[in-house]
Amino acid sequence: MPKVTFSGSAPTLGVHAPPALDPRQPASPPPAASNGTHARGFSPPADMPTWSGTEGVRFDFNDGCRVLLPDGDWTVRLRDMHTDTPLFDAQIGAGVVTSTRKHFVPFLIEIDAGGRRVFKHLFDAHGKPVLIQFEAQRLGEALGWFGYAVKFQRQHRCKLTCSMPAPLIALLRPGYPDIEFVTPELVKPECYYATYRLGRFAGDEAHAYQPSAPQLVGAHRSAAYMLGVDPREAPPRIELTDDSRPLAGPYVCIAAQSALRCARWERPGGWRELQRFLTAAGYRIVCVDSPSPDVADESSALADVAYSLAPDTPWTERARWLRHAACLIGVPGDLSWLAWAVGAPVVLISGFTHPVSEFDTPYRVINSHACNSCWNDASANFDDADASSCPRHAGTLRQFECARLVSVEQIKRTIRSIPGIAC
């Protein structure tokens, strides 16, 4: 698999957005017909590299390393300076050299002509505008990814812009005044020195976007490897405009819903028994996942005894409820990530994911005697798009046993281990 591709037909060089443009200036949304934003929230790079070099060379790092060459006879070399690995060394004419690796690599570009060095550039984002794009459908995981974007900003001292859905911006912007936040349709790709995309990239066997698969290192830590920063997790700083306590008395939040059936805790009578346990201890139950009346499963037993937030409750309001809760009891999903982000103890009922998959919590509940961790097993062919997927035991009595065999007593013991809990 070649590490660098070369296209021999160079676009016509002309007036193109210069690096001096400030991506922090307000931008108006492009017309709907010209909005090239992908459904996942990723904006395509500018048609031509955005930075000007000597001898008519243009370059940037907005889709991996891109080097545009005018007419001439050039010797182009690209090197990964972290691993000291040569990636490309060839004599070419007019064209575009583009690396196949799109995640962060500290590229060195060297160009010779006529036996002399005419251009040299080592990646250096200090003081330069950098864009990090967050996949739109991964709101919870994006909270885990964001800490690595902050590490990238601090490591490279760049002018960071983060593109993400509006609910995430409302949650994160108050805590990070030195970072520019934009929704995907407001991205101006011609302004940036470098761009990186954080998301899940199924089928990326060439590791073009993610050098380490989420199944191996964790859904959030994969972003650390995409950005080349310390993989130790760090929750984001969440500053709420209204951080008052929503209830005077003690309460526990519950997030039992999931689009994936394998994520749900379907132990017969489990949620009802857990509700009685918490109520007897004096805790009110608040369903922060706004359970749908159209979904009938074991968690439906909570409908008549719990207070449920409205379906249109903003993320900032859900964060307020979670921050002041004694704990969240939930399954893997967006609201578990949100609880982690605001510092609430998370009793995470799991099974289909290995503990490496999500944030670290001492209150994870998993039964290792049951089938488990199929999401992390490449041979299991787990299908995220199939809401009823049980890759190992579909159609048998063992289907979804991973979470179902988590007992109420195991969850109770975990809850009692939380400091300050009176159960």
UniProtKB/Swiss-Prot annotation:
Its cofactor is Fe(3+). Changing C374S: Loss of iron binding. Enhances oligomerization. Loss of BimC and BimA polar localization. Loss of actin tail formation during infection of host cells. Changing C402S: Loss of iron binding. Enhances oligomerization. Loss of BimC and BimA polar localization. Loss of actin tail formation during infection of host cells. It is a peripheral membrane protein. GO terms for cellular component: cytoplasm; plasma membrane. Changing C371S: Loss of iron binding. Enhances oligomerization. Loss of BimC and BimA polar localization. Loss of actin tail formation during infection of host cells. Keywords: Cell inner membrane, Cell membrane, Cytoplasm, Iron, Membrane, Metal-binding. Residues 1-10 have a biased composition (Polar residues). NCBIfam families: hepto_Aah_TibC (TIGR04414). This is Inactive autotransporter heptosyltransferase BimC. It comes from Burkholderia thailandensis (strain ATCC 700388 / DSM 13276 / CCUG 48851 / CIP 106301 / E264). The lineage of its organism: Bacteria, Pseudomonadati, Pseudomonadota, Betaproteobacteria, Burkholderiales. The gene is bimC.
